[in-house]
Regions:
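A generic "folded-domain core" signal
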Residues: 21-175
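Residue-level detector of intrinsically disordered, flexible termini
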Residues: 7, 20-21
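N-terminal secretory signal peptides that target proteins for export/translocation
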Residues: 1-2
């Protein structure tokens, strides 16, 4: 159920990324940008960050970013997703780490339409826990394995994420 619910929001969030020109950020906070699209029941608000470091450096990848989204019309808050810039391996077990805490993700490998480059948190309880850790931490490290077998590591600065989340909460308040 969680995977189905999260994928339902994939199309709306996936179309807006730091690398795409279709949507412009409404605000910037340190290393994070905030985006708002739609209105009423279809309003989407999210913050996005891009990695400061990616390894291996020679890996061929598309856009890479991490998103925290609120979709009040669907009752979604703090949905964390990552676009890795390549199709994940079907056996990849991606995870994020902030400090000593790790958070398991699942991939969209079995889904068509480009979802094979996306990952979402395994459990709903981890969404708010990860966002809280991001507010307190300095860096988030995300690891995943490509369909070609390349393990990648992306390091995201968390500078500005607390202010970005405050703005996100104000732009898309809980119902």
């Amino acid at each position: 159920m969680l995977k189905t619910t999260i994928f339902a929001g994939f199309l709306g969030v996936s179309l807006v990324s730091p690398g795409f020109a279709a949507t412009q950020p409404v605000a910037e906070y340190g290393d994070w940008r905030m985006f708002v699209s739609g209105a009423g029941q279809s309003k989407n608000c999210y913050i996005a960050g891009e990695p400061k470091r990616s390894m291996p450096k020679n890996a061929r990848r598309g856009d890479v970013f991490l998103i925290v989204a609120h979709r009040p019309g669907q009752g979604v808050r703090n949905e964390v997703s990552v676009r890795i810039g390549y199709p994940f391996s079907a056996t990849s077990e991606p995870f994020a780490r902030v400090g000593s805490d790790e958070y398991a993700f699942f991939t969209g490998v079995q889904v068509e339409n480009g979802a094979d480059e996306w990952a979402w948190l395994e459990t709903l309880d981890d969404q708010s826990r990860l966002v809280t850790a991001m507010k307190r931490g300095n860096e988030l490290v995300f690891k995943g394995t490509s369909a070609r077998g390349t393990l990648t590591t992306d390091s995201y600065s968390l500078k500005g994420v607390t202010a970005a989340m405050k703005s996100l909460d104000a732009a898309c308040p809980a119902p």
